């Protein structure tokens, strides 16, 4: 089964140390790392720092291949900024309060757990049991969370749809404001 795993570190060097270790041995008898990325919360913006792609095929390359890139793009884009100040609009649209409390949403969890200055390693991993992969972080000051990759793909699709709707709403409001401004200018000229 494929999972998205997020490991948050308060110290960036530990994230890079874990990344290097995993990059040098991405395939074991119990797990295969398909992709991974290091991201850092820089003043509320999620910034990619390093990435790795094993070149291994995923179960369904058509939607899984760009999953981490899409998730990081959402976390680092306008929706991620909305989430940065708290769970915010998007998380409220995607998950209800009980889901946010039990960490079933990558976006909601990230907004609460990846604090400014902190770094995370996010990996797409094929594994039957997360225990062996989790052991790679033993002795490190970090928090490890796992999500079913199919659920994250659905969450990313929902976030993308919301982002498109917000962009359309913003364009419509700008268009209406310009129209109102033109109408006001015309009325002003008529009054002269």
Report each predicted region and the residues it spans:
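A common structural junction motif
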Residues: 1, 23-32, 138-146
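Amphipathic, membrane-inserting segments
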Residues: 112-174
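Short cationic amphipathic helices and targeting signals
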Residues: 2-10, 119-126
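Solvent-exposed alpha-helical segments within well-ordered globular domains of core cellular machineries
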Residues: 17-20, 24, 108, 112, ...
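Short, low-complexity, glycine-enriched hydrophobic/amphipathic alpha-helices that associate
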Residues: 54-101
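Extended, charge-rich low-complexity interaction segments
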Residues: 60-75, 172-192
């Amino acid at each position: 089964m494929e999972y998205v795993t997020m490991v948050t570190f308060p110290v960036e060097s530990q994230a890079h140390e874990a990344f290097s270790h995993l990059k040098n041995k991405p395939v074991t008898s119990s797990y295969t790392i398909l992709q991974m990325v290091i991201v850092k919360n820089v003043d509320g913006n999620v910034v990619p720092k390093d990435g790795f792609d094993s070149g291994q095929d995923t179960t369904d390359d058509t939607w899984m291949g760009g999953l981490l890139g899409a998730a990081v793009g959402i976390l680092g884009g306008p929706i991620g900024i909305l989430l940065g100040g708290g769970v915010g609009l998007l998380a409220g649209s995607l998950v209800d309060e009980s889901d946010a409390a039990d960490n079933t949403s990558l976006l909601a969890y990230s907004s609460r757990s990846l604090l400014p200055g902190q770094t995370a390693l996010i990996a797409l991993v094929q594994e039957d049991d997360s225990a062996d992969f989790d052991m790679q972080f033993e002795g490190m000051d970090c928090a490890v969370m796992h999500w079913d990759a199919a659920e994250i793909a659905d969450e990313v699709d929902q976030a993308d749809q919301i982002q498109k709707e917000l962009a359309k709403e913003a364009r419509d409001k700008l268009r209406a404001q310009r129209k109102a401004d033109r109408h006001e200018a015309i009325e002003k000229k008529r009054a002269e």
